[in-house]
Amino acid sequence: MYHTDTPPRRIHCYDFDAASGAISNQTVLLRTERGCFPDGSTVDAKGYIWSAQWAASRVVRYSPEGEIDFILPLPVSHPTCAAFGRPDLNMLFITTAYQGMMPEAREAEPEAGNLFIFQTDITGIADPLFRPIDLSRSRIG
C-alpha cells in the first residue's frame, strides 16, 4: 500500500493485511526533487505508481522500487490525481486544478482545471470502491 505525503515530497510504502486492514512496516519509497510535490496517484497492473506532481506539470510513473520509469509532461502546472478507467483500464485520466492561481498564471495556463485523458498501452487496476459509513450512529462528530 502506498501513501503520498505532499508537503515533504514523499511517497511511503506499507505492508497491508487485507483481512484485518492492518498496516505495518512504513518505509519511504521515494522523495521527489525540490519543486515537485507528489499528489494523487494510482497503481497499474505491473505495480508501477503513477504520481500526479503538483507544481511540476507532470505525471511520473515509478517502478515498485521507486525509480522513475517515465515522465508524462502536461501543459498545466497543477495536476492533482491520476486514475485508470474505461472497461479495459487502458485510459489514464488526470485531474488538474486552477483554484488559487493568480489571474496572470491562470491566463498563461488556459487548460488548468481541465481533465486530461490519455490512451495507454499499459493496463491499470480498478481503484477500490468506497462504501461510506453511517456517521449518525457513531460517536464521531
Tell me the role of every PLM-derived stretch.
Residues 83-141:
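Blade-level signature of beta-propeller repeat domains, shared across WD40, Kelch, NHL, RCC1
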